[in-house]
Design a protein with these regions (language model features):
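Short membrane-interface loop/juxtamembrane segments of multi-pass integral membrane proteins
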Residues: 94-116
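Alpha-helical transmembrane segments
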Residues: 60-80, 147
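Membrane-water interface of transmembrane alpha-helices
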Residues: 77-98, 162
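Select subsegments of transmembrane alpha-helices in polytopic membrane proteins
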Residues: 34-45, 109-123
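Alpha-helical transmembrane segments and their membrane-interface junctions
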Residues: 50-54, 116-151
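The transition from N-terminal targeting/processing segments to the mature protein
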Residues: 45-49, 91-97, 128-132, 207
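Alpha-helical transmembrane segments and their immediate juxtamembrane interface regions
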Residues: 139-179
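N-terminal, intrinsically disordered, low-complexity segments
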Residues: 1-31, 185-212
């Protein structure tokens, strides 16, 4: 879907996905950040479960040291994420404007992108944990991933609520831009785009969530 900005609003033009391949896309801010928070939290909980299983099986783990690593990683990720989230949200709200000419990601493309992103993250962490089990007898990597993932995930889910609240206050829909071939939204500051809420009857049925 192509969104053409016209002043404070926008015109939605449906085009073939092949014609839009390789172009930047815009995605709903609250939905995208919430999904990222869910993936990071799930990744952290999966790593924590992996460590607990190793501990129950009397594998190569050090509960005391791993607990310290987990707590430090959780605290660091939470504090750093809170500062980054605050700056990211503030910057986006200051730069909020209607989109000029951008691709609105379709539901099918969004589903495919998110599946690939989650698969790559879980596969990468899984390989890292297996290697850590072979070369280490502490289990610190699993604790580190668990703490960082849970902390960052909580921050993202809290930020998603702020995006939803901002949409309600402004009676609009707020979007973030995904670069070509990007699997997740940028963690740093980026511009945001705004479209007014339209009537539900005007929403294209194949693209739910664009105008509600």
């Amino acid at each position: 879907m192509l969104v053409l900005g016209t002043g404070s609003g926008g015109i939605v033009v449906t085009m073939a996905d092949a014609a839009l391949a390789g172009l930047p896309r815009i995605v709903r801010a609250d939905d995208e950040i919430r999904w990222r928070g869910q993936v990071l939290t799930s990744l952290g909980l999966a790593s924590l479960s992996y460590w607990i299983i190793l501990w129950l099986l009397e594998g190569p783990v050090d509960p005391v040291f791993a607990g310290i690593v987990f707590g430090a990683a959780l605290l660091f990720a939470f504090v750093l994420g809170a500062v980054t989230s605050r700056r990211r949200f503030a910057h986006a709200m200051l730069t909020l404007r209607p989109p000029r000419s951008m691709v609105h990601e379709t539901v099918a493309n969004s589903r495919d992108r998110r599946v690939r992103a989650a698969a790559m993250m879980f596969l990468g962490v899984g390989i890292l944990l297996l290697l850590d089990t072979v070369v280490s007898d502490v289990g610190a990597t699993a604790a580190l991933v668990a703490g960082a993932g849970i902390g960052a995930g909580i921050i993202d889910r809290l930020e998603a609520r702020r995006w939803a609240q901002a949409e309600d206050e402004r009676e609009s829909r707020i979007f973030l831009m995904l670069r070509p071939n990007a699997l997740i939204a940028r963690m740093g500051a980026q511009d945001a785009y705004e479209l007014p809420r339209g009537r539900r009857d005007d929403e294209p049925p194949e693209f739910p969530g664009t105008y509600l």
